[in-house]
């Protein structure tokens, strides 16, 4: 587990005392989970990555890995504890004159691990990333996705509990991106890793993350599980992760629906239609498998029959069925009726 608390980072600047790049970031990533960190260019993602990997010392705050504050360490103590955090960058940064096996073995050799143990462990790592048959291949003989797999194996060589993946899929083709994301999820489950996935691609977040945090101008502005964000009508991050295309529609009431935080009745449309004599048009929908539950966001237009229930009654009934509803448009006659 990694726990980041009130993390701040500032730099000296000409004509000013300091420039504050990170402004009190707090974030917890449990074991066996992937948290994506998103945000625009200049938001502070790269600085956060440097602080997490302890390439930069935070100005204040703490970075705890398995309960120990690494941000207060220095020298040999810091170098020893830094092994708990493996890092994968956009470029795999492999040594071109060394084979895949030799690149993965480097951290172990620097640590002084005995050759027999190195051979055993590197073999296991190559198997873990699906490259057992590429042990003797040089980087130039590997595809971009395969090189990134070697980089991931090398990051895991010292058996970290935290893996930082900084734009690890940027620049890869769609097939390689899919394979790397699938690999990260497999490694999360196999080794119980806390994975921090820094990315600017919302599709990567949707496909791999359990939770997501958004940074803007050095502040942590939103965070939550994908299910929570998708099922929250007020979440701007959820709307960007799971967008709906605007459509022209007519009806007595136009609703935006979100679900996923509670069990959903699968026959909710027929239940409502029969109970209140409604005609429901599905205008747009975005449904994702989040963990073991379906979560979704949709827009519907509702035309009432002769019964015409109060719109508050309809929204309450939707809630009882496991759906959160937000009114986007309401006919004047219904507004007057309440």
Regions found by a protein language model. Name each.
Residues 53:
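Helix-to-loop junction immediately C-terminal to a conserved catalytic motif
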Residues 15-17, 70-86, 110-115, 229-233:
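ABC ATPase NBD coupling module
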Residues 174-176:
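Helix N-cap at the start of a conserved alpha-helix in ABC-type nucleotide-binding domains
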Residues 137-140, 158:
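Conserved signature/switch motifs of ABC ATPase nucleotide-binding domains
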Residues 98-105:
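Short coil-to-helix segment of the ABC ATPase nucleotide-binding domain corresponding to the Q-loop/switch region
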Residues 163-166:
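Catalytic Walker B motif of ABC-type/P-loop ATPase nucleotide-binding domains
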């Amino acid at each position: 587990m990694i726990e980041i608390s009130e993390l701040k980072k500032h730099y000296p600047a000409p004509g000013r005392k300091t420039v504050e790049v990170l402004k009190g970031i707090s974030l917890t990533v449990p074991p066996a989970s992937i948290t994506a960190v998103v945000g625009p260019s200049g938001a502070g993602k790269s600085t956060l990555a440097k602080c997490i990997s302890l390439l930069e010392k935070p100005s204040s705050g703490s970075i705890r890995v398995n309960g120990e504050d690494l941000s207060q360490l220095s020298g040999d103590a810091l170098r020893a504890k830094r092994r708990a955090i493996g890092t994968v960058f956009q470029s795999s940064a492999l040594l071109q004159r060394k084979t895949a096996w030799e690149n993965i073995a480097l951290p172990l050799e620097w640590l002084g691990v005995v050759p027999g143990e190195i051979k055993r462990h590197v073999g296991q790592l190559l198997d873990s990333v699906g490259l057992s048959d590429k042990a003797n291949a040089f980087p130039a003989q590997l595809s971009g996705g395969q090189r990134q797999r070697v980089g991931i194996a090398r990051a895991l060589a010292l058996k970290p509990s935290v893996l930082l993946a900084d734009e690890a899929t940027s620049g890869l083709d769609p097939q390689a991106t899919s394979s790397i994301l699938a690999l990260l999820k497999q490694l999360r489950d196999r080794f119980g890793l806390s994975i921090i996935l820094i990315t600017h691609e919302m599709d990567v977040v949707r496909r791999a993350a359990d939770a997501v945090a958004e940074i803007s101008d050095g502040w942590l502005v939103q965070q939550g599980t994908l299910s929570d964000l998708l099922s929250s009508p007020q979440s701007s991050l959820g709307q960007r992760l799971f967008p709906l295309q605007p459509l022209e529609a007519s009806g007595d009431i136009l609703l935006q629906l979100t679900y996923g935080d509670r069990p959903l009745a699968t026959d909710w449309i027929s239940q409502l239609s029969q109970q209140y004599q409604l005609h429901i048009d599905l205008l747009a929908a975005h449904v994702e498998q989040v963990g073991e539950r379906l979560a979704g966001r949709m827009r519907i237009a509702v035309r009432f029959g002769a019964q015409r229930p109060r719109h508050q009654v309809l929204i309450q009934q939707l809630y009882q069925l496991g759906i959160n509803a937000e009114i986007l448009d309401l006919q004047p006659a219904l507004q007057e009726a309440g």
